[in-house]
UniProtKB/Swiss-Prot annotation:
Region (G4): 254-257
One GO term of the biological process aspect: mitochondrial translational initiation
A GO molecular function held by the record: tRNA binding
Chain segments carrying region G2: 177-181
Protein's organism: Saccharomyces cerevisiae (strain ATCC 204508 / S288c) (Baker's yeast)
PANTHER family xrefs: TRANSLATION INITIATION FACTOR IF-2, MITOCHONDRIAL, TRANSLATION INITIATION FACTOR IF-2-RELATED
A GO CC annotation given for this chain: nucleus
Name used for this protein in its record: Translation initiation factor IF-2, mitochondrial
Region (G3), start-end ranges: 200-203
Superkingdom field: Eukaryota
InterPro entries: EF-G-like_DII, IF2_II, IF2_N, P-loop_NTPase, Small_GTP-bd, T_Tr_GTP-bd_dom, TF_IF2_bacterial-like, TIF_IF2
SUPFAM superfamilies, A to Z: Initiation factor IF2/eIF5b, domain 3, P-loop containing nucleoside triphosphate hydrolases, Translation proteins
Length: 676
């Protein structure tokens, strides 16, 4: 880890070793300048001498990256001295071409007693937009609707619950009866009349990241558990994420209508509750505060109790947010896609403030001047307040699902901060390149110092770097959440011999750029939930394979089959005939004596150019393994000889070491089926 981050010298720091033993995360250590400096100033005597001197002015700008020899020129010192000092400070494999990052340069300048006007800030991709946010104003806090996430195992009835509450056919619109991406809806609860926003997170394991994201932006989690199946793998996974999120939880035991007998139903419900207790869920039965409600979304039984429980729990939680139009609006991207005749669209769940037409939003590497707001029924609305999910039109590019949305005053400010974020991305990218370059140079130096082993090392390195065969794919989906889920699903497929390699993953039908990239990288394009593709895409000139799917199981199955076909073949010998060597005789051909094996076929058929093994003795020791050169019957060349007939045989490679009593085994190399 230390080498990967380029902090070679950190591992010599005693304090760092103590912290590592305490299991403090490496990223925290890497950003701690105090820890770094402690190693640099460990030699107290020298440090005390330097501190007494007056700081020297810095007359040059600190670059993001600089080689050791160029830094020596800027410092006006001998490069040998700088390398010696760096080595003393713990750097390894330092050469004149070793590249230093800006952070290291700043520490070196401090060591050389230079005055630094501006040290690198701790701004990173996670907090680059934090200064755009406004502090919470308690006076503006008003009650808002709870955001409820329904989680659970696939086909345990999550979408059916929302279908009941919305009185619409959500289930019928989904391929295979399984929700394919997050939907966000605000409803008026049938009994209380209170507003509730639901996030319907998919139950398929492929959508793990989307479900995690749902848990992080919700207030209440409704965990659905089928009374027939009890806790399943994805149920346990949902429990884990719910615990980590710290959200309040309600358990809904579903499909009770399938068990009409009261005693049997009660027994099944009791089993589910006991299983929940084993998983550490503090249900009311043992004095906890987690409600367990048996329901049937199909018949409506106890659905009013579920709705009432959500409303009452939200009132106890006293959920509030700033609802003033003057408050800087914030939210989360729940879904994003490209719609025909509309363009880039993103569903935003409002966290605070109010979204209105004309406001400027920033998100990731894109921004938006709101052209229109559309509710979940497809109706344009004037504004969206906290806990409301709305489609926002007007994005320059498709934002990523899960990214935070922040309101800004102008497009100029949005562009300024996006540029700042892109610079950080570029620095991060360059940092990886620099680390790799330094490691390659260090390796080259080591190989140069060990010339006698250079060839062996090169061969070993080639074998190690060859790695598994990569099957390239480009993923195109209807929405970004599905694109991410498909990418995650197939990226994990494969083994040490063959693996999936996702070249790119994006939203919309395949473009000309996608086709060119597929041609260059020899990729197959996987389209998910895109409907009918244009004929010019399917019948593209480059002959790129384009496969279309509506259900993720089928996509994963096809990719797995392709990987299986690309596994290295394994063959086993299958004996198809046995032949006895009865005698040997010599035959003169063009002044050359050729020894021929006089044989009789015991079973099967021997063919010209057959693969054979000549074996000898009771243990059938192999004395020859190769092909037949000639096959004769009554002095005539023949293509094959069948059981019971005699023949004369010569072998390739000039093998003549056979003798009477030997046995010839005729075999075929049969490919053994392999599976991932």
């Amino acid at each position: 880890m230390l080498r990967r981050h380029g902090l070679f010298w950190l591992k010599t720091c005693p304090r760092l070793n103590v912290l590592l033993n305490q299991s403090i995360p490496i990223p925290h250590l890497l950003h701690s300048r105090d820890i770094c400096q402690q190693r640099w100033y460990a030699k107290g005597k020298r440090r005390n001498q330097i501190s007494k001197k007056e700081l020297k002015p810095l007359n040059f700008s600190i670059p993001n990256y600089i080689s050791v020899n160029k830094l020596a020129n800027l410092l006006n010192c001998r490069v040998e001295r700088l390398i010696k000092d760096l080595t003393a400070l713990g750097f390894e494999n330092i050469t004149t071409t070793y590249i230093l990052s800006k952070e290291y340069v700043e520490l070196i300048l401090q060591e050389y007693n230079f005055a630094l006007p501006n040290l690198s800030t701790s701004t990173n991709l996670d907090n680059v937009y934090d200064e755009l946010k406004s502090p919470v104003n308690p006076k503006l806090l008003t009650k808002r609707a709870p955001v409820v996430t329904i989680m659970g195992h696939v086909d345990h009835g999550k979408t059916t619950i929302i279908d009941y509450l919305r009185k619409s056919s959500v289930v019928a619109q989904e391929h295979g009866g399984i929700t394919q991406h997050i939907g966000a809806f605000q409803i008026t609860a049938p009994k209380s009349g209170k507003k509730i926003t639901f996030l319907d997170t998919p139950g398929h394991a492929a959508f793990l990241k989307m479900r995690e994201r749902g848990a992080n932006i919700t207030d209440i989690i409704v965990l659905v558990v089928s009374v027939e199946d009890s806790l399943m793998p994805q149920t346990l996974e949902a429990i884990k994420h719910a615990k980590n999120s710290g959200n309040e939880m309600i358990i809904a035991i579903t499909k009770i209508d399938r068990i009409p007998q009261p005693k049997e139903r009660e027994k099944k419900i009791e089993k589910v509750i006991n299983d929940l207790i084993v998983q550490g869920i503090p249900v009311e039965k043992i004095g906890g505060d987690v409600q367990v409600i048996p329901i049937s979304a199909k018949t409506g039984e106890n659905m009013d109790l579920l709705e009432e429980s959500i409303v009452l729990l939200s009132e106890v939680m006293d959920i509030r947010a700033e609802n003033s139009p003057k408050t800087i609006a914030e939210g989360w991207i729940i879904e994003s896609q490209v719609k025909k005749q509309v363009g880039n669209v993103a569903t935003v769940l409002v966290k605070k403030g109010t979204l209105q037409k004309g406001k400027i939003l920033i998100c990731g590497n894109t921004f938006c001047k709101i052209k229109n707001l559309i509710d979940d029924k497809g109706i344009p609305i004037l504004k969206a307040t906290p806990s409301y999910a709305t489609e926002v039109l007007g994005w320059k590019d498709v934002p990523h699902v899960g990214d935070e949305v922040i309101q800004v005053k102008s497009e100029a400010i949005a562009k300024k901060f996006i540029s700042k974020r892109q610079d950080l991305i570029e620095v991060q990218k360059n940092s990886s390149i620099v680390e790799k370059l330094n490691e390659e140079r260090a390796l080259a130096k080591e190989q140069h110092l060990n010339k006698e082993l250079e060839h062996e090392n090169t061969v070993q390195e080639h074998e190690q770097n060859t790695g598994p065969k990569l099957i390239n794919y480009i993923i195109k989906c209807d929405v970004s959440g599905s694109a991410e889920a498909v990418s995650e699903s197939i990226s994990s497929l494969g083994n040490d011999e063959v693996r999936c390699n996702v070249i790119s993953s994006s939203v919309g039908i395949p473009t000309e750029s996608d086709l060119k990239m597929a041609q260059i990288t020899e990729s197959t394009i996987l389209c998910f939930n895109l409907g009918n593709l244009p004929s010019e895409v399917i019948n593209n000139r480059a002959g790129i394979k384009i496969k279309q799917y509506n259900v993720i199981y089928k996509l994963i199955e096809d990719v797995t089959e392709t990987l299986t076909e690309n596994l290295k073949p394994i063959f086993e010998k299958k004996i198809v005939s046995t032949v006895d060597v009865r005698e040997t005789f010599d035959f003169r051909l063009k002044k050359k004596i050729i020894r021929i094996a006089g044989c009789k076929v015991n079973n099967g058929v021997i063919k010209k150019n057959s693969l054979v093994q000549v074996v000898r003795g009771p243990n059938e020791d192999v004395i020859f393994d190769g092909k037949i050169s000639t096959l004769k019957h009554n002095k005539d060349d023949v293509a094959e000889v069948s059981k019971g007939h005699e023949c004369g045989i010569t072998f390739e490679s000039g093998f003549e070491g056979f003798k009477p009593g030997d046995k010839i085994l005729v075999y075929e190399n049969v490919r053994v089926p392999r599976y991932l």
